[in-house]
Regions:
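Short beta-strand scaffold segments in enzyme catalytic cores
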Residues: 16-19, 176-179
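Short, small-residue-biased leader/transition segments that mark boundaries at the very start
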Residues: 1-4
Length: 188
């Protein structure tokens, strides 16, 4: 059946942390959204930025398990792994990277990291700098419908998907669910 696919898009869980080294290999196991180890880092973020400023930048409430809080936890508790990290991805972005070699994210998933200036649809240099993180860790941001690449020969051998199959960025699970339910305009 995999030869019938003309393209692949992704919808995946938000907020997780998949840190990659220079060779694109994970430096540790992923920390997903429901992992609450970063509760102290959440308080650090609130202390450094304040809830009001954080809300102005991210349009989000903060919780343990969000990528930025998990990254701060890693920096504090696993400094050697943090230093080896060259790029941070979200879980679905890691899967797309494995299929295509494209290190990137989409704006809907980036909005759940607590590092995105949502109004500008760009990484918040202010937030990243204030928290003492490296801006270079964050990948390029695309729209969900943007082309990411094609399934590589290596990914084809692992998955059975035909090499050359087009892959699109896709989006965060809650956003894609809303679109699937027809919620596409204000007030719906």
């Amino acid at each position: 059946y995999t030869t019938l696919f003309r393209s692949v898009g992704f919808s995946g869980q938000m907020h997780g942390l998949v840190p990659l080294d220079r060779q694109g290999q994970p430096v540790r196991k992923a920390i997903i959204w429901c992992d609450a180890r970063s509760v102290d880092e959440v308080e650090d973020i609130r202390r450094l930025l304040g809830n009001e400023r954080l809300g102005e930048i991210t349009c989000n409430q903060i919780a343990a398990g969000f990528q930025t809080a998990s990254l701060l936890w890693m920096k504090k508790h696993e400094p050697a792994l943090y230093e080896k990290t060259e790029t941070v991805l979200l879980p679905k972005d890691y899967l797309r990277y494995r299929l295509t070699g494209c290190l990137s994210t989409d704006v809907t998933d980036a909005a759940g990291t607590l590092a995105l200036n949502v109004r500008q649809a760009a990484w918040s240099d202010e937030l990243i700098r204030t928290l003492g993180l490296r801006r270079s860790l964050y990948p390029k941001i695309y729209l969900p419908q943007d082309f990411a690449g094609e399934v590589t020969a290596a990914a084809s051998a692992e998955t059975g998907l035909k090499a050359g199959t087009k892959v699109f960025h896709g989006g965060a699970d809650q956003v894609m669910q809303a679109i699937g339910n027809g919620i596409i305009a204000p007030g719906q």
